[in-house]
Amino acid sequence: MERDPLYVVSPSYISPKTIRFGKILVWSSFFLMMVIGIIQILYNLEKISIGFNNWRPLLYSYILWAIAIGYSRVLIYGERGKRNLFIFPAVMFIISIVIFPMLFGLYISFTDWNLSSLDGRKFNGLDNFYQMMSDPYYWNSLKNMIYYILAVLVEFAIAFLLALLLNSQIKGRKFFRVVFLIPLMLSPVAVSWMVGKSMLEQRFGPVANFARWLGWETPTFFSSPEIARLTMMCMDAWTFIPLMIIMLLAGLQALPKEVLEAAKVDGANKWTMFKNIIFPIMLPVSLTTLVIRIIFKLKLADIIIIVTAGGPGGATDSVTSFIVREYRDRSNVGYGTLLSFVYLILIIIFMTILIRFVNRWLQRAS
């Protein structure tokens, strides 16, 4: 009976020669992939005259490297290597759709690639970075993001009050729970057209007519920078406050009933119960809700793009909407990609600091 060459009982039975062959196999295939990738990059940058017409050789070398890794894991680790093969396809898939696109995007960010140019993309070093440092509209969008993120605190206060209301014994609370969730069921694009383009329309919109009835002679919601920014905040809040309500309501319903009943017996009023019992116990849920809402806020773009296109004068631009317009309106792929990478780095730094602050606060509270 022919012996399975991959079958081993324990790594101790694997010969040093087999282990050495497995390491040589994976490193040689990796070296081959890197050489092909470097040659192709230099060829596209017109630094060398030898190269390939497309990126298929790099794809084939990547597939060869993946096969070599899987086979070498079995050769080196035996049965444990076979178990690793079950997660190996997922790991290689993540590398394919995350790591490689990020590396390609990093390369694009150092080029002058513009889709309207007939010259194609060329390496321009740090020119895109210098352009970003002197771009007032980009820094204005970063300043706007500070306003948008601070608005999350107001959204949280409104969501907490509504969650307390829906958690109380009021008539028709099941009906109101469904009604409050309707904005969350709508897509931001639908909200943009339904509210921003229709209800807030200056001439015939019902909200504008109501504002005239209240005494506002020219109700323009998007002509003034401050009013336009506030309108964007309200539209985005109307869409995502229901999500915060769901999370906070789940936390309120999980509160221990015995503690609340004991506080009532001791004569505590509603404000005392909220300040000393409900809010401290709800602190982990509240902070989690704030973090998740901030993550969604950092991606704010669709409402702004459809309703105001960043206007007036960039007053409502978020970083994401500004980057989208660099791609779509100006076709600046290289510059827009650099802005995306810089924004990604800022988000990672900000969220790391925020999560550490939240963890320390929770540790002190506990």
Where are these regions (language model features)?
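Transmembrane alpha-helices
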Residues: M1-E79
